[in-house]
Amino acid sequence: MKVDTKEVNPAFQSIIQNPGQKVFLDANFFIPPDRSEVAKVRAYSFTDFKECWLIPLLSEFTGLAIHESVYDEFVADSVKEYADEQTSCIPSKLRIHYDSELSGLEEALRNTYINKIAVHSLYNPTRDNAKDRGEVRSLSFMAVKQFLYFAANDALPVRLIKDAAKLLTGLDDMQ
């Protein structure tokens, strides 16, 4: 991974300066890294991952959110249970956004975004397959609601946002 130490990322700087801004997270933010097969090391437990990553993250940044399609990607019960705890605590530390929140006009707009974005992914809206569904549906929802920030450790959403003008995804204002 290449890290630019000369230029400050304006989106990151904005979020650090105002940690209450709405930031959508991809599922990979909630899944412990597992390099046990590659490096012959013990897999990172969810308990340890939660302690050193999720608790500090959700404590410091109060505007964190996920789309329902990302929530559906959580396979491990421990991850879903933790997300449920964070959405139901007072004050809530995580918000789940649902497509049911959209008006009829917003649904039509979301479908347009889905079709524009899906052609650059492995997601097929007709089949509603799992591959890239979370990213495509999250970004589409965000575009309709004009949310700016999506955090992921995945090349697809980064490319869809960074190259929005060239790919004609309609995500030009996102970071």
What is each of the regions a protein language model found here?
Residues 150-151:
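Conserved SAM-binding loop
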Residues 2-146, 155-175:
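Active-site-proximal, substrate-binding regions of enzyme catalytic domains
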